């Protein structure tokens, strides 16, 4: 997916997802799990540099199947889950916390 005005962040995030898979394969035999978390649009300091970010937020609300944005607490809840025993069989995955926004491409 290409996001206008996002610059190099798109390719950087794609590299992060690929690195997650490779690290999971390399570190799995040592019992180390590696996953990536991809949140939906969040109002952060980094996001403030994206042109028309407010419009992006509104588009996310309109397009996401759950018709809402996520907040940082929901992202934190996923992090907590991944660190626990309930996720001990999950590795090499990118998990989305975005109200379904990513499925629409």
Per-segment meaning from a language model:
Residues 33-43, 83, 96-98:
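Conserved SDR Rossmann-fold cofactor-binding beta-strand/turn motif
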Residues 80, 91-105:
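Short C-terminal tail/terminal secondary-structure segment
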Residues 28, 33, 90-92:
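Short, small/polar-rich loop/turn modules that mediate ligand/substrate recognition or access, typified
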Residues 29, 41-64, 104-105:
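A glycine/serine/threonine-rich, flexible loop-to-helix segment
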Residues 1-15, 20-29, 41:
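Catalytic loop of short-chain dehydrogenase/reductase
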Residues 17, 45, 54, 73-76:
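Residues in well-ordered alpha-helical elements
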Residues 20-21, 76-79, 83:
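Short-chain dehydrogenase/reductase
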Residues 64-75, 86:
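A conserved structural motif in NAD(P)-dependent oxidoreductases
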